[in-house]
Design a protein with these regions (language model features):
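Catalytic center-proximal scaffold of phosphoryl-transfer enzymes
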Residues: 1-164, 168, 175, 187-212
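Arg/Lys-rich, often Gly-containing low-complexity segments of ribosomal proteins
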Residues: 182
């Protein structure tokens, strides 16, 4: 199996800048386990889809509807406010919904716990906890989650740096997104120079001529 592109880039930059300390953007750390948990959820949903009983179909719909809640930070789940939810045919809290969903499948619960642990270490900058968790022997995780943790072990130093320092490529990502919006709203640019000038104008790097 080929190594992830992120690992390849890290090896390349380490060779080009041997004295530099690499830092992986925290967004990409969370994205890895986010996708792994989503894949585990969908895998379990497919199992329920093949079942013929009514309960399995109802649980399938719950897993489909509450996918965002499954990805929500556990510490932000509301456990006191009861609201009516049609799929539960009654009032239930966010915490109650998650507890029910996790009770359906042990593998999903284990993947959920792994996801939440990584999210917690990133959110609260806990490099020691992160390092300890990725080196623990984890049982019952999906292949995708196992691969994510393996990637973390390969990139351990760069991730620990990310949890120890405030550096981020968020500014660069913001610029890239704005450039994409400029291109989309203009329905593309045939002339690269015009496209470049439009970007410079947006960022006030180029003066515009006004009619006399």
């Amino acid at each position: 199996r080929s190594r992830p592109w992120l690992w390849t880039c890290m090896v390349l930059f380490q060779a080009l800048f041997p004295q530099a300390e690499l830092i992986i953007d925290r967004f990409h750390i969370v994205t890895q386990v986010n996708r792994a948990l989503n894949r585990a959820r969908i895998g379990f949903m497919n199992t329920l889809k093949k079942a013929n009983d009514l309960k399995a179909k109802r649980d399938y719909r719950k897993l489909k509807k509450y996918w965002k809640l499954i990805l929500k930070k556990e510490e932000l789940l509301n456990g006191t406010e009861y609201r009516y939810h049609r799929l539960f045919k009654g009032t239930v809290t966010e915490r109650g919904i998650i507890d029910y969903i996790l009770s359906l499948d042990e593998s999903l619960r284990l993947n959920y716990n792994a996801y939440q642990t990584i999210v917690f270490t990133v959110t609260h900058r806990k490099p020691d906890l992160f390092r300890s968790f990725i080196h623990e022997k984890q049982q019952g995780l999906s292949a995708k989650m196992d691969q994510a943790l393996k990637t973390f072990r390969q990139s351990e130093r760069a991730i620990v740096n990310a949890l120890s320092y405030d550096y981020s490529n968020g500014l660069v990502e913001g610029i890239n997104n704005k450039i994409k919006v400029i291109k989309r709203t203009a329905y593309g640019y045939r002339n690269f120079s015009n496209f470049r000038n439009r970007i410079f104008i947006e960022y006030k790097l180029l003066e515009t001529k006004t009619a006399a």
